[in-house]
Amino acid sequence: MYIGAHVRASGGVWKAIDNGVELGCEAIQFFAGSPRTWKPQLYSEKDAARFREARAASPIRFVLIHTIYLINLASTNEDFYEKSVTALVGAVVAAEQLGADAIVTHIGSHQGAGFEPGLRRVQTALGRALDEAGDSPVRVLLENTAGAGGTMGVDFAELAAMIDAVDGDPRVGLCLDTAHLFESGVELRTPEGLEAAIAGLDATCGLDRLVCLHLNDSKTALGSNRDRHENIGDGDLGLRAFAQIVNHPAFAGLPGILEVPGDAGDGPDRSNVERLLALRAGAT
């Protein structure tokens, strides 16, 4: 597994590469623009070229763009839904400009309408984003959820239904968040639990759909349905869980991205990256 983190890209998108290298990352994720506004982020060819050049000269192996927080691809509010689809399409366009490998998106909540109506809206949203992508190799990764408030993608069966809804388009993949898995009731702390989770994923979605992991410890208990990230080893998952995860052959060659609060509360930091690198190297 390649260890990385969510990094800042302010002051010039190419600085995301510099910030990742400074943290000791082998992979990075960042927001294309402000995560709390609808304003689309498009890059000049000069800035995009500078980003691609910086990446080529760095040890960064994977680049992911995370969509904005506002997105709800299952929203029952038509205006909000249209803005969400537009934002998803914008992220695909930005990723293609920069040569990013994939975008990661939260799916959203059906807001009480039920899973099936929500699924139909997600299907339409993904279809429009994929149409916009055309022949681009950029993949759209659906992130699982902890399970609160009617959120979509709480288990592998729901994620599989979304993949099936777009006829198994190979450009649709998964980003699994370890904290969300645990908080939704998936045991990852024991070898048996981790193996069962991997088998469940393979039986429903297929392991080939897994493109990225978000490596976050959890402040809340197994099955809490409460999304609260914690620094690696400081939460209910603990170091042994992450030692298993970063060294498991099923995840070999995949990027593992930290989204933890960081020791100073300012986001992922070098110490959390180094913890995971040490675990991958066999330290306990």
Residue ranges: model-predicted function:
Residues 6-10, 33-35, 67-70, 108-110, ...:
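Active-site beta-loop-alpha junctions enriched in small/polar residues
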Residues 2, 156-284:
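Histidine-acidic metal/acid-base catalytic patches
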Residues 39-47, 75-87, 113-125, 150-158, ...:
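Alpha-helix N-cap and loop-to-helix initiation/capping positions
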Residues 18-25, 44-64, 91-99, 130-137, ...:
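Acidic (Asp/Glu)-rich catalytic clusters
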Residues 57, 73-173:
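Active-site acidic/histidine proton-transfer and metal-coordination neighborhood
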Residues 1-67, 71, 75-93, 282-284:
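N-terminal pre-domain/capping segments
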Residues 16-19, 47-54, 87-94, 118-129, ...:
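A general structural detector for well-ordered alpha-helical segments in enzyme core domains, enriched
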Residues 20, 66, 84, 95, ...:
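Conserved, mostly hydrophobic/aromatic
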